[in-house]
């Protein structure tokens, strides 16, 4: 909605794997969602990705080839652990976030999304599970992308509050994500 409210044309394309229950963190289970927006009409799916958000190493590895040279890659660096890197086939002792060639080819923004989301949402006076808090990482990433592309976040917050608070009747989730 924030893209349309800004007067841009947009197109979306979900990408869900055929593997319904692939092991978490593996290449087989990577899902994605492409959002394309422009100040002119969009008639094609585009040639290359200008900016990518990778929430884990599997998402990074599966989609890196589509990002144009010099493109922006925002990663949840908290997920780039030895175990997660191994699950998606990286060699032992290799972390793509420390690769000089990749760092010179792309603008890689390493953000500790999991840690920052938890630190900002954990309150001792509320009974909220870590699992519910971790589900808010997507909204944290959306906030980064909105800032990066100079998009107003208020309409998104209103939609989140309406959807989770009114439609889904989960006011705590609405509050956590807004």
Role assignments for model-derived ranges:
Residues 1-178:
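Active-site cofactor/cluster-binding pocket
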């Amino acid at each position: 909605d924030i893209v349309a409210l800004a007067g841009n044309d947009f197109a979306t394309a979900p990408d869900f794997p055929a593997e319904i229950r692939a092991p978490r963190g593996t290449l087989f289970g990577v899902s994605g969602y492409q959002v394309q927006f422009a100040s002119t009409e969009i008639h094609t799916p585009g040639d290359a990705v200008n900016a990518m958000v990778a929430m884990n190493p599997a998402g990074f590895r599966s989609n890196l080839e589509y990002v144009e040279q010099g493109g922006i890659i925002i990663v949840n660096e908290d997920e780039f652990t030895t175990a997660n890197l191994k699950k998606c086939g990286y060699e032992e002792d290799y972390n793509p976030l420390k690769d000089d060639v990749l760092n010179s080819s792309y603008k890689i923004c390493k953000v500790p999304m999991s840690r920052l989301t938890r630190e900002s949402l954990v309150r001792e006076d509320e009974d909220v599970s870590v699992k519910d808090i971790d589900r808010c990482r997507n909204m944290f990433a959306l906030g980064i992308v909105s800032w990066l592309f100079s998009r107003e976040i208020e309409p998104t917050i209103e939609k989140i509050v309406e959807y989770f608070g009114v439609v889904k009747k989960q006011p705590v989730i609405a509050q956590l994500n807004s």
